Amino acid sequence: MENKQEILGQYFTKIEIVHQLLYLLFSYKKYDNKIKILEPSFGTGNFIKGLKGKNYLNIDGCEIDKNLTKNPCDFFEMPLTKKYDLLIGNPPFSKYNLKESYFSLTNYFKSAVWPSLYLTKKELKKDKEKIENIFILKSLKHIKDESSSIGYVLPISFFIKNKNKSVKDEILKYFSTIIIYQNDKIWFDRNIPCCFAIFANINKLKNKIIVIYENSIKNEEVFNIKNIHEELIPQVIFHKNNGYIKNDKGIPLEEFLENKNIKVKKSYRENNISASNILEKNKIPANKLVENYKLAVVRVGNASVGKCGLINIKDDILNDMFYIFDVKDQYKKNKQIKETICQQINQKIDYFRNITCRVGSKSIKKEDVYNFKVII
């Protein structure tokens, strides 16, 4: 099958990482060895091996890839009557530009386990949804009782601010404690930013979100569970709290920039402005109308995210890598303000590189630009 790994969302967690994640889980949640466990997409079986190494033997597993098991089975076909004390593993991840890697409702119209039994109303209205989200939703229906837990490796993008809101809201119906763990190691055979999320009910941590980033030292932050829709990426929080993302002086750009969509000329092939030359566009020529110049900030790309330039909306053609901003009415003819903002953004490109941690290329939100502070 072409692109089989990406279509099936297969990213197999290294065994040494599995041991670390199991240690973390059992340090927070105590279970005896007789509990019933499900690994819903066991892949190469590293989580099952790790559990058996700790003498947890009552384990069921699902794996859809017939090349990895003699008895392939689809987790979405598993009867909801099967209940577990612990669901753990590494669900598949959807690749954003690969339709086949997403969960499609049409594939399960004839299923004995009708998706309406585990999907939210919002997900039922969608043609496709990220498969990791559907794994979470169905897993919630397999927990045995309030003492049950889920521990899944997830793309770090799951915890981006205001993303996956319906899934997060559903999680809160079952669990009052969330632990999000990330470290500086590579967990798969490729570097995919990810985390280990534990959903549980732990009395001493009721209504708490524990965010952990480990880089030889374990750095921990605690939030109220009401913050579930905020940005909860451990590495980003660590960077903010330890000075790697320092931007605490000045005035937020939202005081200078309009919150409007700006139309510009775009072309993938026939453009004269791209991330490779945007830094050259830091001045407004003396013979040009200042009001025609807008701020262009690169929104995506590991090496380019955060670069800024001044583009002429009458003359320039851009590729699709930019957010475009215009200043408020009182600044539209102010050349100095525009050039100063551009200069100060470019002096702190690392700020934007460190504030983001996504699956694939680094990317920023418009909100990150509006919150950036400048001294004018």
Predicted regions and their residues:
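Conserved S-adenosyl-L-methionine
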Residues: 53-58
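Short, flexible helix-coil linker/hinge segments at the edges of structured domains or between repeats
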Residues: 101-123, 128, 166-170, 192-193, ...
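C-terminal substrate-recognition regions of SAM-dependent nucleic acid methyltransferases
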Residues: 4, 8, 184-317, 321, ...
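S-adenosyl-L-methionine
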Residues: 1-30
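Conserved Class I SAM-dependent methyltransferase catalytic core
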Residues: 21, 120-183, 196-198
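Adenosine-cofactor binding site in Rossmann-like domains, unifying the SAM/SAH pocket
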Residues: 60-79
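Conserved proline-anchored active-site loop of SAM-dependent methyltransferases
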Residues: 21-22, 36-50, 74-116, 133-142, ...
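Phosphate/oxyanion-binding active-site loops and adjacent basic polyanion-contact surfaces
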Residues: 10-18, 65, 128-135
